[in-house]
Amino acid sequence: MKKVGIIGVESKHAEFFGKLINVDKAYPGFFVEAIAPIDKADRLPYVLERCPIKKICDSAEELIDSCDCVLLITRLPQTHYALAMKCLDAGKPVFVDKPFTASVGEAKELLEVSLKKGLTLLGGSSLCFDPSIKLNLAQIKSSPLTHFKFTADPESPFGGYAFYLSHLTDLCTSIYGETHLVSASRKGNSISSLVRHASGIALLSTSLEPHECEIIYEQQGKSSLLTLSDTNCYQNGLNAFFAAVNGAPSSNEYLSQSVALIGEITNFFLNQ
C-alpha cells in the first residue's frame, strides 16, 4: 500500500482527490496517509468531513517524509516550484496542480530534475487526461484549425487570467507541443488567443459563461466536437499519476510549453 500525501487544502481538489482515494477506494494500492494544510488551515475541518485523513502535518517537509508520493494542490503557482522540488529532492513522485509553475525556468528545472532522478512528475489540468482525447488524438492532431473553449475569469482572485487559462494552454501543448502566440483580442470578459504550432493553428477562447470544456476540430472537411467532462477529470488525473507511479510511461514536456504560452498571452495584454 503506497502512502499518499496532500499538500494544501484551499482548493476543492483536496476533498475531491481525498474522497476518491480514501472513501470511494478507487485506487486499492493507494491511501491518503497525511495532509498538510499549509495554505488555509481553517478549511481543514471541511475537507476532513468529506475524506477522513489520520495524519495532519504542520509542514510540507513532515508530510513528504511520511509519504510515498505527493499531491501538491496549493492554489497559487508561485508556491509550486519550491514545494515540488522538496518532493523530488526527497525522491518522491509528485503531482503538481495547475497552473504548473509561475515561470518557464521553474517548470524546466523541475522537469530536468525529475528526469535525472527517474521520478514521476505530472500535473497541470486534469482535463488533459480525459480518455476521449487519446481516442481522437490522430484526428485532432491532423486538424488544420482546432478551437479550444472553456470558462475563465480574466480577473480571477487566484492570480488573474492565467489561473483558468492554464486549462486550455495545457490541453493545447499536450496535443500539439510547442506553440506560439500569433494574436489575441478581448471584448469584455471574453478573450480569444490565436496560436501557431508545427502543423497548424489553434484558437483558445474563454468567457465567463459556465460550460464544459470543448475541443472543436476539423475531420474530413467537417467540424467535430469533443466535450471534456469536468466531473470525471479528477479521477482521470489520478489514474494517470498513479499509473505512472506504478511504472507506466508518461510525458510531461508539455507542462513547460504551457507555462511559456501562458506567459506570451498574459504579456500580450500587459503590454497593450
What are these regions (language model features)?
Residues 46-52, 62, 66, 70-72, ...:
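C-terminal helix-rich "cap/oligomerization" subdomain common to oxidoreductases
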Residues 14, 44, 80, 107, ...:
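A general structural signal for well-ordered alpha-helical segments in protein cores
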Residues 101-158:
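A contiguous active-site-proximal alpha/beta segment in oxidoreductase catalytic domains
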Residues 186-245, 249-256:
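NAD(P)-dinucleotide binding in Rossmann-like oxidoreductases
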Residues 1-51, 141, 242, 253, ...:
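N-terminal Rossmann-like dinucleotide-binding module
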Residues 36, 148-210, 260:
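Rossmann-like dinucleotide-binding domain that binds NAD(P)(H)
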Residues 11, 75-78, 100-101, 127-129, ...:
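Short beta->alpha connector loops
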Residues 46, 51-111:
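Beta-loop-alpha module in the N-terminal Rossmann-like domain of NAD(P)-dependent dehydrogenases
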